[in-house]
Amino acid sequence: MVPPRHHPGAGRPGALSSSPPFRLRSSKFSGIALQDLRKAFKIRLQMVCVFIMNRMNSQSSGFTQRKRMALGIVILLLVDVIWVASSELTSYVFTQYNKPFFSTFAKTSMFVLYLLGFIVWKPWRQQCTRGFRGKHATFFADAEGYFAACTTDTTMNSSLSEPLYVPVKFHDLPSEKPENTNIDTEKIPKKSRVRFSNIMEIRQLPSSHALEAKLSRMSYPTVKEQESLLKTVGKLTATQVAKISFFFCFVWFLANFSYQEALSDTQVAIVNILSSTSGLFTLILAAMFPSNSGDRFTLSKLLAVILSIGGVVLVNLSGSEKSPGRNTIGSIWSLVGAMLYAVYIVMIKRKVDREDKLDIPMFFGFVGLFNLLLLWPGFFLLHYTGFEDFEFPNKVVLMCIVINGLIGTVLSEFLWLWGCFLTSSLIGTLALSLTIPLSIIADMCMQKVQFSWLFFAGAIPVFFSFFIATLLCHYNNWDPVMVGIRRIFAFICRKHRIQKVPEDSEQCESLIPMHGVSQEDGAS
């Protein structure tokens, strides 16, 4: 009978099978290692969560910007359709009632319908009450400072105060004694002491961050109430909107009057083509008076505008059924209207930096009110000078003017300004070029107008300039023309590489004496 085999180290102290002290220490070490592993896993999980949240926030912000751009493009396309239909209806009205000033005055005065919002919309009435603002005076002051800080392009380091160095007082905690003294403490690793600096740096955030700090310390219902107030304080007051409307009332009326005069002298397609030159004026004015980063001047934007201007020249050289003299007058009125439209959109975007800051219906409501109160003496001036005789239209023409004013002016101008705020001022003005193919089709179908090949050759570059400007603004002022010029310049003027020449002693010098090594090898 063969006796059972025993492990060679089974009877020695400290063996795995029979040593209780080692089993106790190993279990303690495994517990400590498990706790460290859990802490490391928890920290790593938190880091992953933070990384995912940051990625989601960055993607959501980019998605929001893409949604704003897409919504603005859709709105501008809808405005183009409305404008072409309105232009055709205006041309029909001018065949029976050629009064551009009366038509412009009547349609602009219809903006006053937006002021009915003071009756049906409570936030508008709250902006006119002093008690509402006085009740929350402290919050409004903090919020105004917050919005003022948001509009400025400053970094966090520049907004911090000067550093203040204060000595640090450390309080050493009493060392904790282990509960179980039977455990071998010699095997437990000692915690390393970390030495900190005796001086700490203190910087104070600016007062513009007081609103966020205050909201972070409030309860959830209070925060929701303050957020509703924040939406109100972020907008301009009724008095401020009225002041802006008073200035832009004259600019907008002259721009629209020039457009109406152009429609009375030439075809709709030619007027829309020449009106697209507002992109050039917008590019120049936006570079001089930028409202945001999207208005920055780039060489690619200039090339897109030049492409549009080249198409405009071809369109102007094309023949049409009307006399050349009236075409010239209509072209001049179109260019004047394009310049005034550029002044209008650039200045209003510089005055109001965000679309949620200005109540667009209230703005146009005050424009209609000031137009109705201040511009009526123009009838007497034009009548007695013989430029336009005053005559009241018949019922059919009056109905066409009312419908055209409500849809082609009141609704379309609101949508166009909203689309400009969602995209950029350059895209909003170049959106006028998209009325070209629609107006061509409308003139050919309704008025049987024949255009030469120069007209179509000029319409194509004007049409594509809009999409070029949209892509450039979408990709954060991407300037491929400047990038290409820089690469070509770098390729032509590149420096020749220094090549190794055998006569150069420094290049041939070796740090290791190879001849010595070869001699030793040869000797061996």
Swiss-Prot record:
It is a multi-pass membrane protein. Its main location: membrane. The gene is SLC35F5. It is found in: Membrane. Residues 13-22 have a biased composition (Low complexity). The modification Phosphoserine is found at residue 207. This is Solute carrier family 35 member F5. Residues 1-22 are annotated as: Disordered. It comes from Bos taurus. Keywords: Membrane, Phosphoprotein, Transmembrane, Transmembrane helix, Transport. Residues 253-317 form the EamA domain. Putative solute transporter. Belongs to the SLC35F solute transporter family.
